[in-house]
Amino acid sequence: MNNKIVKKYKIAVIGGGFSGLLCAIKLNEAFNGQVTLLERNDRLCKKIASTGNGRGNISNKVVNENFYHGDVALVKACLKRYSNDSLIQFFKECGLLTVEENGRIYPSSMQASSICDVLRLKAKSENLDVKLQYFVTDIKREKSGYMINNELFCEKIVVCVGGKSMKNFGTDGNLIPILKRLGEEFTELYPSLVQLKTQTDKIKGLKGVKQQANASLYDGEKLLKTFSG
């Protein structure tokens, strides 16, 4: 006889990065604490530290449906209900001020850790149920919801685990086959933002150095692209 106690929630959010944590906080407010957040790492928002070159690129000045693919009508409706201004106001209410630089939105501290600290404190103040080092290996669809790892039942699931781009942060695509078995469809994933490899002997001493500069790419004598940053 199996006497294992199954914990029940209204909603389970899988993935405790920026999107997952913010989503869980807002849902927890709306559903009176009936939300759990499942994160495989030993701390929340682990990947945020790498965004914006360590400065935390929260958002951009211009955010609209033209920057998304897929169901444009859905994106437009979502952005109408929760706009970029809504996000900035949320952080302001949490005590985090922001600044704009070249169309990008950063915390005024220019430290990605500020974002992590604010979101973690907000989650704690809202008594959000957070399960760290929780690795989701199985999801079963049941009559009135979903069973996760045969021990957590929830009526709804929100998946915020990213793609396959950063395995060292836990973003390795492990949930994709599980979600496919549930009938979810995925487009093929390809590397889109990758490094350029060069001979390192002449630039080795520049490692870690940050400098405002222009960089131009040429194909022979033909200028292909110039980037400032």
Task: Kindly give the residue locations of the regions a language model identified.
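Short glycine/serine/threonine-rich phosphate/pyrophosphate-binding segments
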Residues: G20-C23, V161
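Short beta-strand to alpha-helix junction loop
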Residues: V75-S83, N102-L121, K164-T171
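Beta1/beta-strand and adjacent pyrophosphate-binding region of the FAD-binding site
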Residues: I5-S19
